[in-house]
Design a protein with these regions (language model features):
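Feature responds to low-complexity, polar/acidic, surface-exposed segments characteristic
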Residues: 22-46, 54-118, 123-154, 167-176
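Histidine- and acidic-residue-rich, metal-dependent catalytic cores
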Residues: 161
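C-terminal beta-strand-rich structural cap/linker in extracellular carbohydrate-active enzymes
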Residues: 7-23
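Non-catalytic cell-wall polysaccharide-engagement segments
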Residues: 158
Length: 176
């Protein structure tokens, strides 16, 4: 993440991989992290919170942004549908339907915590749908101690996510 001269938060890594965000009524207002008591400018995730809130991708919770909260499948559906320009203001019902209709997810267990391999699979399907996956963008996962524990459905997506720096290992493991 970085700030532009006009103090707009940018996320060049995700933009490079095609996850550019359509115009939002909130873009450029810098309402972001400054309005959340649980997000401080010194936090490592501050720029990310600014980006997702300034671009209307996330709104936080009733009591703050909740950066330590576990991400659910529904949360990712909502974010991806908003990146795709959908109006998903009803929390997740419309986003769930969008994810099913676009083969991003099967739409099951919305409140379940999302695993790293589920995250990779959904991002990969979205990137494929947008024509953003290049043939040379896959990594060899054999260097990770738990590579064999990656589910078959997510193997190619995990290779793509690692090759493109979307996911990295933790202590020599993928933790799928």
């Amino acid at each position: 993440m970085r700030w532009t001269a006009s103090r707009k938060c940018e996320c060049p890594h995700l933009i490079r991989h095609g996850f550019a965000v359509p115009p939002s009524p909130h873009r450029g207002r810098q309402r972001g992290a400054q309005t959340f008591a649980d997000v401080q400018e010194s936090d490592w995730f501050y720029d990310a919170v600014c980006y997702v809130t300034d671009n209307g991708l996330m709104n936080g919770t009733g009591s703050g942004f909740a950066p330590q909260q576990t991400t659910s499948r529904a949360m990712l559906w909502a974010v991806l549908s908003r990146v795709d320009g959908q109006n998903a203001n009803d929390w997740y019902a419309a986003a769930q339907l969008w994810a099913i209709q676009h083969d991003i997810s099967d739409g099951t267990v919305p409140e379940a915590p999302i695993t790293r391999e589920q995250l990779a699979a959904m991002l990969y399907r979205y990137a494929q749908r947008k024509g953003l996956v290049r043939a040379a963008s896959y990594a060899d996962l054999s260097g990770f101690a738990d590579a064999a524990s990656v589910s078959a459905y997510a193997d190619e997506a995990m290779q793509w996510a690692v090759a493109n720096g979307i996911l990295t290992g933790m202590g020599g493991k993928l933790c799928p």
